[in-house]
Amino acid sequence: MKRFINSTVTFSVTVTIAVIIFFLLSPVTSLGSGSTYAVVYGSDTVCALISGQPTQRILCYDTRLNINVTLNPGVSFSSIAAGDNFLCGIRSGGYSLLCWDNIGSYSPNRKRIYQNDNVLLETLSVGDKQICATVNGTNSLKCWRGSVSDQSKPPNERFRSISSGVGFSCGVSIRNNRILCWGTDPVKSNQIQTGFGNTPMVTISAGKSHACGLNTTGNLICIGNNDSGQLNVIAPDQPNLYSSSLSLGSNFTCAMRISNNSVVCWGGGAERFNNVTDSISFESISSGPGLICGLISSNLSIMCWNPTNFSRIFLPFPEVLPGPCVESSSSSLCSCGVYPQSDKLCSGTGSICKSCPIQFPASPPSQFPLPPPPPPPPPSPSTSSPPSKALTRGLLAFAIVGSVGAFAGICSVVYCLWTGVCLGKKKVHNSVQPTITRGGSNSRSNSSNSRSLSIRRQGSRMLSMRRQRSGTSSMKHADKAEEFSFSELASATGNFSLENKIGSGSFGVVYRGKLNDGREVAIKRGEVNAKMKKFQEKETAFDSEIAFLSRLHHKHLVRLVGYCEEREEKLLVYDYMKNGALYDHLHDKNNVEKHSSLINSWKMRIKIALDAARGIEYLHNYAVPPIIHRDIKSSNILLDSNWVARVSDFGLSLMGPVLGKDHNPYQRPTKAAGTVGYIDPEYYSLNVLTDKSDVYGLGVVLLELLTGKRAIFRNNGDVEEEEGCVPVHLVDYSVPAITADELSTILDPRVGSPELGEGDAVELVAYTAMHCVNAEGRNRPTMTDIVGNLERALDLCGDSHGSISSGICSIVSD
C-alpha cells in the first residue's frame, strides 16, 4: 500500500509542479519590453541600470557622439524601456513612472507619467510613441501617450506578458493565453492579433511591424510583415530551442538559444553574423530598429552590433544589472534562486532573482500508471510510530486530492478531444441532416458508385476558438473615430459632386473622397431636408453606426475612420473599398461571361462568402455585447483593393440577444427592418429578432453567389428580365432545385461547371445556404457552423490556405 501511495504521490506532485513551473515565465526583452537596458529609437543611444552602487541609476551612452549622460543620479529604477527618442523607467518599488524626451540631447526633458503609492507598476512596455505597463498583483493594464488611452486597450483583460512595437502593442491574456493587440495602427494590430489567432502563447515580443512569441509547446511563432525575412524562424518546428529572451528590430528578429545562451538572428541579412555570436553567452538581448545589444554573462558588459554589417562595439559602462534589485526581505520569493553576487551588484540594498526557464507541460498520460504488485505485509501496529501513521495519512490525503485533480484534468483533455473529433462527424444541424448523393452522369446516376457527401459541423467549437478575433473597446465616439469638419469633407468630395457619388447607405448618399493627408475614404452624407420621421431614422442610423463601428475592429468589417456632426449635417467617414459592392459585380450588365469579372470563379466566390461569414461571426460571438446586423445583403458586402470582403452599413444594427435566466438566448421583440428579399420571414411576421435573422440574410447572399441572380427577380425561363413576368424570390427558385439534386441547373453559367475538386465545394455551399434560409430560425445553423462549412469548401477547392491567385492579384483569406 505504501508503494502505491508513493507512486501516486509522485505522479500527483509531478503534475502539480509542471503546472506551477509552466507559469513561472522569465522576462521578455525586445524592442518594446522593459529590461535593465534599452536602445532608444532614432538616436542609437543605449541606456542601462548600473550595478554596484547604492542607487540603481540610469546611465546612457550615445554611440554616435561617444558621450555619457546620467539621468536622475539619486534615484533607483527597476526597469527601463525606450521609444522614439524617449526613455521611460519604473522606479524601484513600482510606485512611479518617469519618462525623458529628447533623450539624444545633452539635457533630456523629464516628465512624471504615473504616481500612485497604492497601485504599483510591474512590467513596462514602450513602443515608438505608446507606453503601457501592468499592475503588480493584478496584471491589469495601463497605457499612456500615442493616443493609446485606457479606453482603447482591451477592457478588463489581465496580461502575463506585454510588448510594444511601432503603432501597436500586444499582450498574452492570462484568461486564455491568447494574443490581444491594440494601438494607434488598428490595421497592424488586427493583422498581428489575427495572425496568432487562438494559438495558446506564453510570451510575446514586438518589433517595428511584426511580433514573435513562444507557444505552449515551446515553438517560436512570428507574425506580421515579412518583407526582409524577419518571420523566417530558424528551425521553427524544433520545440524548446529558444528561450523567452527575444529581440525584434525593424526588419530582423533575434533569439537566445536555451542550450548555451548564444544569440541567433534572421531577417535583413542579420543571419550572416550568427557564427560570430555563437561563442558568446548572453544574459539577455535588446534591440532598436537597426541595432542589437546583448548583456554578456561573463562580465555583465553590453556589446552592440549592426545587423547589416556587424560593426560591433563594447559600451563603456560599468557592470550592468542583469535584473532588478528586490528588497532582501523579498529575496525568499525568488522561485529559481538568487543571482550570484547579488549583494555586490545591488550594493547591499537587495538581491536579484534568477529568471525562471519556461517549462512546458508534457502531454498528460492516457491513463493512470498501473499500481505496483502488492507490497509485503506491513509491520505490526506495535512497531509503527505515531509520526509514521500521521505521515502516511497525510500522504494518502495528498495522493487522493492529487489523483482526483489529475483525473479531472485528463477527463477534460479527453472531452476536448472527443468534442473536437467526434463533432466533426455530426451534420450541420441536429434537426436537419441532409446528404448529397451525386452520380457522375445520368447513365450512372443509379449505380452503386454514387457517393454521399454530408455537411459536417467540423468541430465548430474548436474552429470557433481558432477564429477568435480582436475584442471591442469603448462605446464612446471619440475613442476610435476622428472628428472632421464639414468643410474638410466637402473639400474631399469636390463639394459632394455627382461624379464622386458611389452609392447609398442606410441614411444617406455615399461619396468617394480624398482627405488632405492623401487618404482615400468613402463619405456617407445624411439627407439634409428630410421629413421628421425620416430625420429621426437618420439620427438613429447615424448614432448606430458610430456606436458600433467605433468599437469594432476586424478584418472583415468596414472600418469607421471618423464622423462629422455640424448643425443638421451628419456624415460618416469609412475606409474606401476600391472594388465596390459584391452586388455590383454579380449583377453588372457588362458581366456576361467568365472573363468579364474576377469573381467569376467558384473559388473566389466561396472565399468572398467565407470573408463575409467571418465578419458576421465576429459580430455574433465576439463583440461585447453581441450585435445583430439586420441588413445582411450583397450590396452591404464590400470588396477592398485586395478583394477581401468586409461587412458594411450598421445603420439598422441592434445589440444582440443575451442569455436569459434559463440560459437560452433571449429573443428581442422589435419592429422588423431590413431589405426585401433578404429579410428573415420569421422576423418579419413575428417581430422577434435573433441572430438567426442574419443567418437568413447570408443564406440569400450564398444563393446569389451560386446562381448569379438577384434576391428578387423576374424570371422568364432561363432569362432574368428587368420588366414583365412574375417576381420570383431567389429562395423559392433555388431551394427546390437543391433538394431535388438538380443544383447544376441553377448554377451561374458565367462561372461555368465546377472544375475538378470544386464540385463537392459548391454542393457544400449550396446545402449550407439551403439550411440558412430555413423558414424556422431554430433550424438554421449558427454562424460558427457556417464558417466551418465554408472553410471546408474552400479547402475542397484545392487550396488549404485559402489563397487565390490570378494574373491580376494575389488574394489571401486568413
UniProtKB/Swiss-Prot annotation:
Gene3D superfamilies: Phosphorylase Kinase, domain 1, Regulator of chromosome condensation 1/beta-lactamase-inhibitor protein II, Transferase(Phosphotransferase) domain 1. Keywords: ATP-binding, Glycoprotein, Kinase, Membrane, Nucleotide-binding, Receptor, Serine/threonine-protein kinase, Signal, Transferase, Transmembrane, Transmembrane helix. It is found in: Membrane. One of its GO terms (cellular component) is membrane. PROSITE patterns: PROTEIN_KINASE_ATP, PROTEIN_KINASE_DOM, PROTEIN_KINASE_ST. GO terms for molecular function: ATP binding; protein homodimerization activity; protein serine kinase activity; protein serine/threonine kinase activity. SMART domains: S_TKc (SM00220). Glycans are attached at residues 6, 68, 136, 215, 226, 251, 260, 275, 299, 309. Residues 366-388, 433-478 are annotated as: Disordered. ATP binds at residues 502-510, 524. The active site is at residue 631. Its main location: membrane. The chain crosses the membrane at residues 394-414. Serine/threonine-protein kinase. This is Putative serine/threonine-protein kinase-like protein CCR3. The gene is CCR3.
